[in-house]
Structure formats: structure tokens, C-alpha cells
Amino acid sequence: MLSIFGRATFAKATAPLGKALVSTGLTPDAVTLIGTAASIAAAVTLFPTGHLFWGTMVIWLFVMFDMLDGAMARARGGGTRYGAVLDATCDRVADGAIFGGLAWWAVYHEQSKPLFVATLVVLVTSQVISYAKARAEASGLSADGGLIERPDRLVIVLVGAGLTGIGGYWGIEWLIWAVHVAMWILAVLSIVTVAQRVLAVRSSPGAREILGASNSGTEQPS
């Protein structure tokens, strides 16, 4: 949802920053790698040790930094196919680290099985949501839309984790449950989004055509 309503505004707001970064000689791919590496480092060190607030702050900072690669690409006149693949791949790895770090905290620090289950569901479905779209597009079909995409997931999980961190520092009991609520909301919305994307593929033109034996569409192991 945020991807639809906020993309144009974000692109316009970050255009000057993109031009400034390009003038330094930094490349969009370098920004992608730096932002991803820093987000992963924060997720696997701060979240598992219970530093949810500071983990949220660091991850949010570098997620915003990582998003500047698009502004830089536009400032240079366009991106590359390699850059698009690198960005998408790094996003999946960063998401895995964020939800993996939270899952570790849920098990070994919070000792909450329900929170672990919700986080695990989100970890899996977040990858499936992105994969379904990529696989559909590779087959010439459409899997756009759905209730929740990556920007939505990041906002919900980071707000929840940040509020829980604040609740822990200040002893505000009800705030401590923020990440629990956030993860269950994400789990439900992510499952719905997976179903929406599969149905979108099913209703795409040509989706029900019978393929020949030599082009069965069976995915080969990678």
C-alpha cells in the first residue's frame, strides 16, 4: 500500500540527495551494498540481544540510505539490469536478517513461542510474496498488488520493535506488547497477500494456457 501511495513523493523528495551522492563518485550499487550490510549487522547484533529500540533506529537509518540507490540511478539517467537484480536480492537478504534477528530474540530473550511463530510466518511469507511476483513476471504474467509489500512490512515491524524497545527502557508494560501485535498483524496480512498474488497470477491473460511438453514451465532447481 505504501509502495503505491508513497513512491512518487519519495522519489521527488530524494532527487536532490541522489544527485548529490552521484557527484561524490559513489555508485547506486555501492549504496545498495552499504545499506544492506549495515542493516544486516544491526539486525543480527542488536535485535537478538534485546536492544530493539537502537536496532530499529540503526536499521531505519540504513534502510532509508539504501533507498537512495533509486534516486541515484535516476540522477544518472537510469539504472542497470544488474543493479535491479542486486537491489532485489539485497532486500531479501536484509529482510531475512531483520525477521531472523527478531525470531532469535523471541526464542532466547523473550521466550515467547507465539511471537516466534508469527515472526517465522512473516519471514517465510515475505520471501514468497516477492518470489511470486518475480516468478510470474518471468513467465509473462502479472502478480502486482496485494495488501502488503516491503515498505509496509518494514514500517510495521520497525514501529512495533521500536515501541517495544521504548516500553522496555521506561517500564511501560503495554508498550512491550507492541512488537507482538505488529508481528501477528504482519503474519495475517502477509498470508492474505500471498493468496492475492497467486490469484492475480491465476487470472492473468494466458495463465491457464496448456504448455507443450518441451516448455512445461516446471521450475528447474537453482
Which residues make up each language-model segment?
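Hydrophobic alpha-helical transmembrane segments
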Residues: M1-V58, V63, I98-S222
